Amino acid sequence: EFQTPEAVMVYSGDGLNGMSQAFHQLYRTRLARGYWRDRERPILINNWEATYMDFDEEKILSIADKARELGIELFVLDDGWFGKRDDDTTSLGDWYPNLHKLPDGITGLAGKIRDMGMKFGLWFEPEMVSRDSCLYRAHPDWMLGSTDRPVCTGRHQYVLDFSKDQVVEYIGDRMEEILGDGGVSYVKWDMNRSISDLFSAGRDARYQGTVYHRQILGVYKLYERLTRDFPHVLFESCASGGARFD
């Protein structure tokens, strides 16, 4: 079974600006949905430019305390909180807290941020995997690309094969473990590279021509699962490398 891509079209007699505004209106009133659609977003601070991946709980709480004084409503912990990630060569896919940096885990840190009167947000890059990761070592066939030739990298990372249900389910399970304690109010969903090497290991030649579309359907499946199970969490897409707006 294969579902072809959907297209969204509008008409305007007022040129490109009118067409752009018609698209905005259509998406905001008919296609966007959920708890956050018409609500004002909280004012947030993100630690990325302040620390990159060089942080521990003490440093994060120090930034959060200053943010609290400024009236910031949401603190977002960016890349580097999971696996053994101290740089961008490792640990994507290993979505469990780095207890060396955060000895009380995400739950403990989130509680301390909330005690300051702010909500807590967290960075994920769900569609990606590092070659130096427990996930890749356990499932090298879960990466997009042929197993008998080199696969292109971007930012030292690879793309997971979201055309496979078991991959989507696994990543969903790991994310739900983190989100399930109720401490995370916001998710920054990143995607820092383009999709290439469109080959799904173990599939026949006919299937390969549908991989790109099935990949995005897999992303949508994960969107649907998480927004259904966590309707009050604000999910924000950040895809400087992926060039998407979904």
Q: Each PLM stretch: what is its role?
A:
Residues 7, 47, 181:
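Pocket-edge structural micro-motifs
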Residues 7, 77-80, 189-191, 237:
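Generic detector of well-ordered alpha-helical packing
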Residues 1-13:
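Short Pro-Gly-centered flexible turn/kink motifs
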Residues 98-105, 111-115, 136-246:
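Active-site neighborhood of glycoside hydrolase catalytic domains
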